[in-house]
C-alpha cells in the first residue's frame, strides 16, 4: 500500500 494512500486516509480521519 503506497504511503501516500495511507496518508490520505489518516488525514481524512484526523479532519473528521
Curated annotation (Swiss-Prot):
Q: Which GO terms describe its biological process?
A: proteolysis
Q: How does activity depend on pH?
A: Optimum pH is 7.0. Active at pH 4.0 to pH 9.0. Stable from pH 5.5 to pH 7.0.
Q: Which domain of life is it from?
A: Eukaryota
Activity under varying temperature? Optimum temperature for activity is 30 degrees Celsius. Stable below 40 degrees Celsius. Above 45 degrees Celsius the activity is sharply reduced.
**What are the record keywords, sorted?**
Hydrolase, Metal-binding, Metalloprotease, Protease
Question: Could you tell me the EC number(s) of this protein?
Answer: 3.4.-.-
State the top-level EC class. hydrolase
Molecular function GO labels: metal ion binding; metallopeptidase activity
Q: Keyword Protease: yes or no?
A: yes
Which cofactor is recorded for it? Ca(2+); Mg(2+); Mn(2+)
What else the UniProt entry mentions is: On the 2D-gel the determined MW is: 51 kDa.
Q: What does this protein do?
A: Metalloprotease which hydrolyzes the alpha and gamma chains of fibrinogen. No activity against fibrinogen beta chains. Active against the synthetic tissue plasminogen activator substrate H-D-Ile-Pro-Arg-PNA and the synthetic plasmin substrate H-D-Val-Leu-Lys-pNA.
Q: What is this protein called?
A: Herinase
- Taxonomic classification, please? Eukaryota, Fungi, Dikarya, Basidiomycota, Agaricomycotina
Amino acid at each position: 500500500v503506497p504511503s501516500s494512500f495511507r496518508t490520505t486516509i489518516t488525514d481524512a480521519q484526523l479532519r473528521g
